[in-house]
Amino acid sequence: MTKPDFRAERDLRTRGFWPVAGIDEAGRGPLAGPVAAAAVILDPSKLPRGLNDSKQLTPGERDRLYDEILLHASAVAVAFASAAEIDQINIRQATFLAMRRALLALSATPNYVLIDGNDLPPDLCVPAETIIKGDALIASIAAASIIAKVTRDRLMRRVCRLYPAYRFSQHFGYGTKAHLAAIAEHGPCPFHRLSFRPFREA
């Protein structure tokens, strides 16, 4: 299986676009918690070893790469859109919002942005393109996928301490049988997305 590489970023650099940021999200599908987005500008001389789409990595591999990315990347930022914002503006717009927030939070301003997927956020203020399966192809996007996933998972573990009945540390807000059973027994908590099923059907 092909691993993500830095060719797209190098090509953009030869065309005068530098630095280049990769952006990816985590947590579009869960019934609870925020959606997270990360933006990463990698240092081409210090590329993390073993970069891959976060979904293809074990938790231990993700944690190792998370630390390595934070240590060696030129710039890293993570941002969220809350469950309340998701309910107010819908998950698609909330994902765009988190991506814009992450981009603005970078300590360096990129001249080009590569985004996972096929849905380009509006109003980014810098040239950008989407790449389907970008987290499996593009090093900067893969790094962003790891940062977003690990950051969101750690947040949901903290939320679990506030609301232990839902066992968020086991499923991170996704609609597992155990999570649905806890919702049926206890009702929603403030971190649930009330615009999502099963809440809309209650």
Give the location of each predicted region:
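RNase H-like, Mg2+-dependent phosphodiesterase core
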Residues: 1-202
